[in-house]
């Protein structure tokens, strides 16, 4: 058990260093998936040995470790293949090389710089769906990679590789799901495309304007609700299709609501760290909520317990909002402090990886 624990600690330490580095070098992302593969192997072996915990970490079921290991092998192989092309010189983020992005339509393709397309069904302003058009789509064709662009027409969203046109969003099928009249309107920038009487008729094609694309690095940490065009990493308020939240997508953060509904006036954010507690709520405990991909938070929590245990009081396991109205699907870790001074000392000393975001707040003592 000690040998597995030491190897797992070393593996997770390397993972956290990669998250903190937040590199755009494709070689680093290949290394990231090698570490993920190694971690899955160790956890799988630990479960076979009958272990339920390794230190403070729960050992997942065999099926979970096996599935994650298969995903890691798949990503490692495709990234190593991409590494042998001219596209390896381009900047790549953790999110762009994540398994969640790999499975986002169009599936099993790498993609960058997405733009939102709004589709209105039955002419009803309240019945809309958002889809994503990707400026760059990297498609594997005969053991090589080709970079193509998404296009929009009245039938759907597609890319063309060679002589083949591949639709990854079909508006006819979407209209059957979300509408009743089989009528839809595609709103893309200043262009509006209406559903034709016969979908097989000549349709208008729209390419992506280079000047209006978004990248993960351009996404602000706090997103204003009045923004007209959301970045791909930020789920819009309406129902969305074609965009999944990325595994290390903490670069873009939805606003966290109050932790204690009785203390709405106590919640602070990154842009107001000097706000103090209301005198009438002196029993509230200072907290920090960290958001990010589950594995990032798990490694971060391990480092906090190992190196900075004197800088906080309690730390939670990773948790998620279960409601369908949840503002995001990130994992969350909550840390409590004895005082605001201790919390500030924590923030001054601890290096928080750029792939993990945080919010300040307070929690009533009776909740702890």
Curated annotation (Swiss-Prot):
Localisation per UniProt entry: Host nucleus
* Record-level GO BP terms: DNA replication; DNA-templated transcription; regulation of DNA replication; viral DNA genome replication
Source superkingdom: Viruses
Span list, region Transactivation domain: 1-200
GO molecular function, a single term: nucleotide binding
GO CC: one term?
host cell nucleus
Q: Where is this region: Disordered?
A: 208-241
Binding partners and assembly = Binds DNA as homodimer. Interacts with protein E1; this interaction greatly increases E1 DNA-binding activity. Interacts with protein L1; this interaction enhances E2-dependent replication and transcription activation. Interacts with protein L2; this interaction inhibits E2 transcriptional activity but not DNA replication function E2. Interacts with protein E7; this interaction inhibits E7 oncogenic activity. Interacts with host TAF1; this interaction modulates E2-dependent transcriptional regulation. Interacts with host BRD4; this interaction mediates E2 transcriptional activation function.
The molecule here is called Regulatory protein E2
Native organism: Human papillomavirus type 6b
Q: What is the lineage of its organism?
A: Viruses, Monodnaviria, Shotokuvirae, Cossaviricota, Papovaviricetes
């Amino acid at each position: 058990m000690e040998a597995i624990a030491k190897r797992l600690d070393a593996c997770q330490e390397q993972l956290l260093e990669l998250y903190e580095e937040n590199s755009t070098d494709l070689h680093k992302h290949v290394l990231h998936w090698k570490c993920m593969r190694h971690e899955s192997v160790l956890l799988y072996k630990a479960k076979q040995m009958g272990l339920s915990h390794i230190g403070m970490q729960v050992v997942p079921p065999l099926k979970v470790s096996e599935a994650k290991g298969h995903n890691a092998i798949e990503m490692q192989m495709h990234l190593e293949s991409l590494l042998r092309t001219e596209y390896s010189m381009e900047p790549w983020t953790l999110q762009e090389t994540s398994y969640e992005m790999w499975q986002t339509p169009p599936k099993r393709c790498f993609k960058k710089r997405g733009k939102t397309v709004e589709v209105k069904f039955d002419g009803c302003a309240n019945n809309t769906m958002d889809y994503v058009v990707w400026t760059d789509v990297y498609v594997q064709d005969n053991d090589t990679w080709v970079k193509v662009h998404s296009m929009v027409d009245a039938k759907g969203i597609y890319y063309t590789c060679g002589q083949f046109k591949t639709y990854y969003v079909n508006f006819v099928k979407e209209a059957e799901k979300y509408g009743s009249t089989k009528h839809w309107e595609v709103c893309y920038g200043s262009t509006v495309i209406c559903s034709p009487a016969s979908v097989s008729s000549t349709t208008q094609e729209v390419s992506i304007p280079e000047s209006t694309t978004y990248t993960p690095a351009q996404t602000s940490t706090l997103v204003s609700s009045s923004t007209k065009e959301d970045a791909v990493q930020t789920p819009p308020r309406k129902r969305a299709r074609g965009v999944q939240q990325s595994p290390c997508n903490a670069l873009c953060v939805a606003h966290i609501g109050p932790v204690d509904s009785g203390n709405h006036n106590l919640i602070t954010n990154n842009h107001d760290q000097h706000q103090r507690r209301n005198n009438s709520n002196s029993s509230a405990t200072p907290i920090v909520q960290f958001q990010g991909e589950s594995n990032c938070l798990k490694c971060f929590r391990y480092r906090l317990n190992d190196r900075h245990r004197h800088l906080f009081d309690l730390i939670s396991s990773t948790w998620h909002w279960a409601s369908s109205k949840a503002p995001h699907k990130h994992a969350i870790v909550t840390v409590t402090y004895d005082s605001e001074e201790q919390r500030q000392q924590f923030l001054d000393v601890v290096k928080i990886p750029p792939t993990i975001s945080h919010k300040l707040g307070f929690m009533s003592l009776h909740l702890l």
